[in-house]
Regions:
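N-terminal Rossmann-like NAD(P) cofactor-binding subdomain of oxidoreductases
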Residues: 1-172, 189
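Active-site-proximal catalytic alpha-helix in oxidoreductases
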Residues: 146-164, 175-182, 201-213
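Electropositive phosphate-/nucleotide-binding environments in soluble metabolic enzymes
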Residues: 11, 59, 117-121, 174-178, ...
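General small-molecule cofactor/ligand-binding pocket signal
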Residues: 30, 195-197, 241
Length: 261
C-alpha cells in the first residue's frame, strides 16, 4: 500500500486531491488530528511516514515546512508557486519531454505547475521547440477560469454574496505581474514574457487558455495539429483533437473535474 500525506488537506486544492486519491485502492491516505494541523513536528512525522507528501499550502507555509523537512527522504510535491522556478526542484509537467518525465520520476522534490501556466505552456512549448515561433516573440495569452481557482474565499464570495459585478467575467492581474508568468516564460522557453490576461468568470470550475501568435511560416491547420500530436505522442492526459472532433463552440468548463487537457 502506497502511503500519501496531504499537508493542507482542508483547503480547496487539498480537498480535491484527497477526493481523487480516495478512489485509488492502492493508496492509503495518512490523516492528522485537526488540532495538530499547524503543529510543525506533527506534520513532519506524517511526512516522514509517507512515501509521497503533497503540500497544499500558501507559499510562505510551504517554504517553512520544506526547510523543516530538508533531511527527509520522502518525495514532496508542492502545489504553491514557491518552488516552480527553483533549482533542485523538478517541474511537474512530464508531458513536456523525456527530461521532464525523468526528473519527475527521480527527484525527491517536485513543483506542481500552476493552473494558468499548464494550459499556456502546453500550447507554446511545442511551437517554440519546433521553431515555428521565436522565443523572443511577443505573445498574448488569455485564460478564462472558474471561480473555484481562487480558493475558499473566492468560492464564498461567488456563492454567498449578491454582487452584480460577480455576474460577469472579471479581468485581473492587470499589472502584468501575475504569479504564473515566470514559470510560463521559463518552461515555454520564452525570452520575452507574454502579455497575460487571466479572467475569472461566474462558473465553478474549468479553464480555457488561448494563445495568439502569427503563423509566419504559413503552416496549414493539419500540419499544426500534427506538430502537437507528434510532440505529445500518446500522453494519456493530453488529447490533440482532429478537425472532425472540434465543436462549433468550445466551453471553458468542458473538462471541469477532469485531469486532462
Amino acid at each position: 500500500m502506497f502511503k500519501v500525506f496531504i499537508d493542507g488537506q482542508e483547503g480547496t486544492t487539498g480537498l480535491r486531491l484527497a477526493e481523487r486519491l480516495a478512489r485509488r485502492s492502492d493508496i492509503k491516505l495518512l490523516s492528522i488530528d485537526s488540532a495538530l494541523r499547524k503543529n510543525t513536528q506533527a506534520r513532519l512525522e506524517k511526512i516522514s511516514q509517507a512515501d509521497v507528501a503533497f503540500l497544499c499550502l500558501p507559499d510562505a507555509a510551504s517554504k517553512e515546512i520544506v526547510e523543516a523537512a530538508k533531511d527527509c527522504p520522502t518525495k514532496i510535491i508542492d502545489t504553491s508557486t514557491a518552488f516552480r522556478c527553483s533549482d533542485g526542484w523538478a517541474y511537474g509537467f512530464p508531458e513536456l519531454g523525456h527530461a521532464y518525465a525523468s526528473a519527475v520520476a527521480n527527484s525527491p522534490r517536485i513543483a506542481n505547475p500552476g493552473c494558468h501556466a499548464t494550459g499556456s505552456i502546453a500550447v507554446l512549448a511545442p511551437l517554440v521547440a519546433a521553431g515555428l515561433i521565436p522565443a523572443d516573440g511577443l505573445y498574448t495569452l488569455t485564460s478564462l477560469t472558474g471561480y473555484s481557482g481562487g480558493g475558499k474565499k473566492m468560492i464564498a464570495e461567488y456563492e454567498n454574496l449578491h454582487d452584480p459585478e460577480l455576474d460577469a467575467p472579471r479581468l485581473y492581474g492587470l499589472n502584468q505581474k501575475h504569479k504564473h508568468l515566470p514559470e510560463i516564460a521559463k518552461y515555454a522557453k520564452l525570452t520575452t514574457a507574454p502579455i497575460f490576461l487571466p479572467i475569472v468568470a461566474p462558473y465553478y470550475s474549468g479553464m480555457l487558455v488561448t494563445a495568439g501568435f502569427a503563423n509566419t511560416q504559413g503552416l496549414p491547420l493539419a500540419a499544426l495539429r500534427k506538430l502537437f500530436a507528434d510532440f505529445y505522442g500518446k500522453q494519456p492526459f493530453i488529447q490533440v483533437q482532429t478537425s472532425e472532433e472540434l465543436p462549433k463552440m468550445l466551453g471553458s468548463n468542458n473538462l471541469a473535474g477532469k485531469d486532462s487537457l
